[in-house]
Amino acid sequence: MKIYLATGNKHKKREMTELLPEHEIVIPSDEGIDFDPEETGKTFYENSIIKAKALYDIVHAPVIADDSGICVDAIEGRPGIYSSRYAGPDFPQGRPDGIKITQEEQNKYLISELNKALENPKPDFENFLHGKRSCHYTCAFFLYLGNDRIYAVQETFEG
């Protein structure tokens, strides 16, 4: 079966192809489809379904979509749904010009923001599940087969 993957990320396509070798996994750019839906949701779940529906409306075929990110407890869950656009504490939802920074730069900003937060700890830091540097990774995942056939899962991995 041909399944569209609602992403432009070739790495995700490779991973999904390995997980589902009996299916043809296609990303929009493989077929010249311009696909960049506005992720206006407030949760990973909402953004995932936005992407799934948007691509399904174009291809009218099975679509897999996901949205995921890291949420750091000491900095109020940032970067959260903005993980892929995160550009430091000054631009937690991404740079105004839309330019994305490298993953290495994102990591440096995130560690710097966390370290600053830990310099002035809040009383609830001790209550975090895995200590003051605790975080969790959340992934919402959809298989969209049309308005009446939707399969969804969301998992959180604590750390």
PLM region descriptions:
Residues 2-4, 11-159:
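Anionic-ligand binding patches
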